[in-house]
Amino acid sequence: MQDSAKLKVLFIAGFGPIVRDTGESRRLYRDVLGMPFKEEADGYLHSEAVPGAKSFALWPLSQAAQSCFGKDSWPKDIPEPQAWLEFDVDSVEKATAVLESGGYRMLVKNKKEPWGQIVSRFISPEGLLVGISFTPAFREQK
């Protein structure tokens, strides 16, 4: 672990592909690979039952765009991400400031989602939609 880090990642909150064709992705991940997904009314497939991951989800691009920009289409001037990755951190606000001071363009800053998560998002150099978050459900003792 690097001692000079400016922020502390507590754990990987979740990851998965950002999908363009939900049917094809459902067929691969659920039907062929046997992933135990819960399916929401809007077609969002997610699982908190895959060992080694707090959450694995197939996130439709339109839903990622809605979360980041408040509309169903991804902006043409920002590369479309292929996958998402979220890290839970001590302080989303501090982590956001550290990332911005490092030159990262935040797409969303300190947004509170309906399920209680606080998140900031940016595109990584590899083209991933990266979130730094505080996810209360993942912090509760089981």
Regions found by a protein language model. Name each.
Residues M1-R26, Q82-F87, S133-K142:
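N-terminal beta-strand motif that seeds the catalytic metal site of vicinal oxygen chelate
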Residues D3, G70-K76:
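Short, P/G- and charge-enriched loop/turn segments at secondary-structure junctions
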Residues G16-Q63:
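Core segments of cupin and vicinal oxygen chelate
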Residues R20-G23, P79-L129:
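Vicinal oxygen chelate
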Residues S47-G52, F122-P125, T135:
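Active-site beta-strand termini and strand-to-loop segments that position acidic
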Residues W59-P60, R121, I132-R139:
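Short beta->alpha transition motifs characteristic of CBS
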Residues A65-D72, R139-Q141:
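A short, acidic/glycine-rich surface segment
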